[in-house]
């Protein structure tokens, strides 16, 4: 079945317009949502500021959206900062003293905060107080300032890099996991309505199963399919058009992209399936180690294509099968 796309004249607020505003609009993550809903409603019922929250998991799964939802739920403001920009106490002072009572202070990539800034945050989290130094030299003096009670929400893709003193100061900790194809179809259905795109379930499923379990990527692919249909297919969209559009991005039916395929090919063709060190793989595909570990390896492991061992990464029989390679020599199959 073929559908028409209504061309939007303004799409500058694409990501913001698709962001869910309430937990009921947030698809997937059922257990996390249930816990967070209880946590927030209990605080509101007691007329208290909710405790500090930490969300962790791979990028693009909705950690920032949860911070927005929290602010909407309790009816307060949202102040956003990024960990790499918070290196020293002076980077935090203006943000902390500017908070209003009940505000959500969201720090993305909180694991990348500077150590000095992190330690400066401790009394702010525990007692809602900070010390500032006035003047300099022998006449310098420290003054303690009271802060308005606030909720710190941290987001990280690397929870293991958080120090224990910081991690234990969060009252609520939740992992955001990869989404099922069914959840992604629900997300895409909502997004297509907001973007005035008519697409059936078959088309949305074609996009969802190539989105690596990630809503952000799913929405980006939906926008790409819309653009492709607009420019190449007379604004008509169906599953065949979606398949052609996604093939142009070199994304296969499992959601693997060019880098994923290159990683598996290097492991199989040059290192007999492994084990191979991540530094070696990074040099072979022209990416840095951190990018591979954060953006590519988790999905390959999730799909059962790669195993992590003490000696390095190993391509599994599924990887051989997906790349149409013969696993006989490596795995002893007949």
UniProtKB/Swiss-Prot annotation:
Head domain (RuvB-H), as annotated region: 253-334
Enumerate the SMART domains for this protein: AAA
List the SUPFAM superfamilies hit by this protein, alphabetically.
P-loop containing nucleoside triphosphate hydrolases (SSF52540), Winged helix' DNA-binding domain (SSF46785)
Q: Which GO terms describe its biological process?
A: DNA recombination; DNA repair
What Pfam families is this protein classified in? AAA_lid_4, RuvB_C, RuvB_N
Q: What does the entry list under GO cellular component?
A: cytoplasm; Holliday junction resolvase complex
The entry's keywords: ATP-binding, Cytoplasm, DNA damage, DNA recombination, DNA repair, DNA-binding, Hydrolase, Nucleotide-binding
Its assembly, as annotated, is: Homohexamer. Forms an RuvA(8)-RuvB(12)-Holliday junction (HJ) complex. HJ DNA is sandwiched between 2 RuvA tetramers; dsDNA enters through RuvA and exits via RuvB. An RuvB hexamer assembles on each DNA strand where it exits the tetramer. Each RuvB hexamer is contacted by two RuvA subunits (via domain III) on 2 adjacent RuvB subunits; this complex drives branch migration. In the full resolvosome a probable DNA-RuvA(4)-RuvB(12)-RuvC(2) complex forms which resolves the HJ.
UniProt-recorded name of the protein: Holliday junction branch migration complex subunit RuvB
Q: Which organism is it from?
A: Chlamydia trachomatis serovar D (strain ATCC VR-885 / DSM 19411 / UW-3/Cx)
């Amino acid at each position: 079945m073929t559908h028409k796309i209504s061309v939007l004249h303004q799409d500058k607020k694409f990501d913001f317009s698709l962001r869910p505003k309430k937990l009921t609009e947030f698809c997937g993550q059922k257990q996390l949502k249930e816990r967070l809903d209880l946590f927030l409603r209990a605080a509101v019922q007691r007329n208290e500021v909710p405790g500090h929250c930490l969300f962790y998991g791979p990028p693009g799964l909705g950690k920032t959206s949860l911070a927005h939802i929290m602010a909407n739920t309790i009816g307060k403001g949202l102040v956003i900062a990024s960990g790499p920009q918070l290196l020293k106490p002076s980077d935090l002072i203006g943000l902390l003293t500017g908070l209003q009572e009940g505000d959500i202070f969201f720090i993305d990539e909180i694991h990348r905060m500077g150590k000095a800034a992190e330690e400066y945050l401790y009394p702010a989290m525990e007692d809602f107080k900070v010390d500032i130094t006035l003047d300099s030299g022998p006449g310098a003096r420290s003054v303690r300032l009271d802060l308005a009670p606030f909720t710190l929400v941290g987001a990280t893709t690397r929870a293991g890099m958080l120090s224990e003193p910081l991690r234990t100061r969060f009252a609520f900790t939740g992992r955001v996991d990869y989404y099922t194809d069914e959840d992604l179809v629900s997300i895409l259905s909502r997004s297509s309505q907001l973007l005035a795109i008519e697409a059936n379930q078959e088309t949305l499923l074609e996009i969802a199963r190539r989105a690596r379990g990630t809503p952000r990527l799913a929405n980006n692919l939906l926008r790409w399919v819309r653009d492709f249909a607009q420019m190449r297919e007379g604004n008509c969209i169906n599953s065949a058009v979606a398949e052609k559009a996604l093939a142009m991005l070199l994304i296969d039916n499992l959601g693997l992209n060019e880098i994923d395929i290159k990683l598996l090919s290097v492991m199989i063709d040059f290192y007999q399936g492994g084990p191979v060190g991540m530094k070696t793989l990074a040099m072979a595909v022209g990416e840095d180690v951190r990018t591979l570990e954060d953006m590519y390896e988790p999905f390959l492991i999730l799909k059962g294509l790669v195993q992590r061992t003490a000696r390095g990464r190993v391509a599994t029989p599924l990887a051989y099968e997906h790349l149409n390679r013969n696993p006989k020599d490596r795995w002893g199959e007949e």
